[in-house]
Amino acid sequence: MITGNGADIGMTSLAEDCGPVLAWLQTQTGADRLECLRIEKLSGGAIQENWLLKLQIKGGSHDGHQSWVLRTDAASAVAVSNSRSDEFRLLRAAFLQGVTVPEPLYFCSDNAVLGQPFFIMTAMPGQAQARKLVRSSGLPEQGLELVAQLGHIMAKLHSITPQTKFKTKGLGSEELLFFLPRYEGSAASFQIAQMRAALDNLGTAHPVLEYSLNWLEDHLPIWADAASPALCHRDFRTGNFLIEDGKCTALLDWEFAGWSDRHEDIGWLCARCWRFGNEKLPVGGLGTFSAFQKAYEAASGQLLNVTAIGYWQVMAEIRWAVIALQQAARNNSGQELSLELALSGYLVPEMEMNMLNLIDEIEQGIWADLDS
């Protein structure tokens, strides 16, 4: 039996008719009875939609009260983002490797259920709002331990390579990430080519971004590493992980994950655009780089190339600027009218200033330590 009596719902498509999803979930869980207590659209997620489902399940594989999240596509998406089926596989691989992520439960490819693919994962406790996190009263005491934990989590993630096989129940070893594209040469040169193509597709002139890409290309011998790629989140930053009592409970939003140089994730996490005004704490505005580096190197058994991180920070500013322009284009084209998306384009000058300042610091030889 399925019931939605008493559900706390808003006026949105899923909340207006959750019956097909609940029927599908009852089949997946083998439940005798599944009652929806609450449906709530979660904030954030400019590229995907996330819905909190509070369920009471009787019988089957998940008997009892459950808090799950349904994740599906927004009205339009950034072209380079992974599909929901691919993101589910990525989340499953990370979970099996012991990365701190929500447990992925079920994937639905039947468009008759919701109109588009979606997956279900466990809801995790914690706060993700970046500006609240970087201004937390407990940050001075908890920041060092928190960024050390982030270093351990990232090292665990980067232990996944294209050769990694995952042990799954009843299936033996399985290669879950077969779908991820591989690149020739270095991740750095591959990223430059991707950003150039993205700018060309926008059809508007952005000379600062073009200059910065040229500068990165001119300096490839310094920061490009053709070493074996690792699985990188590629959006590992404050705002994409949940924090509860000073500890990370889950790394979220895997739509950009793929093979890359592990320094890309570190440059992204430490980029100025993701410090949210907390400039003196380079690791996402939360803590020092030295604490992060010590934990990462201890957990991974690999030393970091700190010089390369500066160049990856420039790339991070470029990439976020391109994504912001793409998001603004989604609004401007009429695909998805949203004030948040429209305002994204106005963030680009700040990123351009960040990349120019960083290039200047590197060229003058005064960029040497992220904590300085």
Residue ranges of each PLM-predicted region?
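Activation of the activation-loop gatekeeper triad in protein kinase-fold domains
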Residues: 252-257
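Conserved protein kinase catalytic-loop anchor
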Residues: 229-231, 249
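Catalytic-loop of the protein kinase fold
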Residues: 231-233, 238
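Juxta-kinase regulatory segment immediately upstream of eukaryotic protein kinase catalytic domains
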Residues: 2-32
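All-alpha amphipathic helical-bundle segments outside canonical DNA-binding/catalytic cores
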Residues: 303-315
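ATP-binding pocket architecture of kinase catalytic cores
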Residues: 40-211, 215, 219-228
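Active-site activation/catalytic loop segments of kinase-like enzymes and analogous catalytic loops
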Residues: 263-301, 315-334
